[in-house]
Amino acid sequence: MIAQRPRPDRGWLVTVVAAAAVGLGGVLMLRGVVLRALSGGAGRLSPGAGLAAGTGALLLLVVVGLATPTVLGGLIALRRHRLEARGRPYPPRQRREWKPGLAVRAVHGGIRSAGAILSGRPRRRALFPFDLVEVCSLEEILKTLDPRGTLDALPFMPEMAAYCGEEHRVLRRVDKINDYVTGSGLRRMRDTVLLERLRCDGQHHGGCQTCCHLLWKEAWLKRTSGNGRSFAEPDGPPLPGSCDPAFREGDLQRLVTRVEGYRGVQYVCQMTEVARASARLSWNDPRHYLRDLLLGNVRLGPFVVGVSIEMFNRVQKRFGSGVLYPQLATTGLATSPHQVLDLQPGDVVRVRAKHEIERTLTAGYRNRGLWFDTEMLRFCGGEYRVSARVDRLIEEKSGQLITVGNPCIILDGVTACGEYKVFCPQNESILWREIWLERVSPAPRDEPRLTLQ
């Protein structure tokens, strides 16, 4: 039974009203300062009075600027909370990315060129969402790898070789990533992108079925016009750490596993190497937000929504009731219930309502060890097709292949959007317990397997 607690939306409404009052008061005071300055005449104000008026106006602008997203974030939280209570989904209606124009590309190219000169390391022109690229030949890619089969500590995996020579579009840039291996949080990545629909099939990693989105270094890609012509860039000096030319495709397979003492065989993949392939990044550093907005990863609308919710939560935590959005309740039980639906790819299912899922969660927001993340709430009440069953996966911290006793389900087109995780671009597949789903209709015979974006 879910423990009873005060309704969070009441505290949220108080914060919205208070922030709106502060913002309105700031607007009225700012209007008064401006009118007084205009009526008095600029020449009649002493330097001290002018400085005080200017400082006051600036402070009022800051107050209004902080109050506005707080109110907007609170209203979004209240609306979504009502939808969750009614079991109605609110998934993203369109892609969050946009295509940067020539001006953005030129400015970013200049900054990148300056960085290359200062660091002494050649860097290609950046890739952006919607760019059409061709994956370099395997021979070209192998020349960029060090003896560990990595570039900037990011492995090129054998599963990626199948796409060499193919044309694909860039989904988004990966300038930051969440480190779930060491728990160090948000980390900075460079010169890395996702390509549309290219996910790891786990063929060379023990049949891992988590369908992680493959990470591609820009050095492994080249722009193409779409008519078979690619735009090769000057190679420049060899990349630091480039391996011996004798490095072969078979070496990639050899580097997939390693043996470490009592732990036995451990798999090496891009997700196990996230910490090594990235650098620490402060959550309070605003530059990663600017990169998201200016370089095409997040359109203005989703950006405003995400930042407003974050601002609302910060105000709520410091000045309000402390109850943040989104909220989940749990049963508090030590063990969680289980249900077997034997779902198969192609089955149509409905994600259960929030209050139904809450009854299946232990104190750690888990069911049989699988965490129900707040990113998943937006899909509650929606109908989706099953894309895959997951009963084998690589545990990222240990690198060991695990057979899952309670299979998980991946739904077609249902991925983490990163709105509550500072717009993290990983586009992870979301794993679902069968007890969180209900079958709507079985899969038609001979229906082709669906793929995630």
Residue ranges, per PLM feature:
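Membrane-helix interface motif
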Residues: L28-G41
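Membrane-interface segments at the starts/ends of alpha-helical transmembrane spans
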Residues: G43-L59
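Basic/aromatic-rich interaction segments and small domains that mediate binding to polyanionic partners
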Residues: R86-G101, G120-R124, F128-P129, E139-W220, ...
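Carbohydrate-associated surface elements
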Residues: R318, G322
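Alpha-helical transmembrane spans of integral membrane proteins, capturing the lipid-embedded, hydrophobic core
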Residues: V16, A20-L24, L58, V62, ...
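Membrane-helix interfacial anchor on the cytosolic side
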Residues: V64-R82
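Juxtamembrane interface helix immediately N-terminal to a transmembrane segment
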Residues: I2-G23
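Generic structural signal for buried aliphatic residues
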Residues: D131-V135, G346-V351
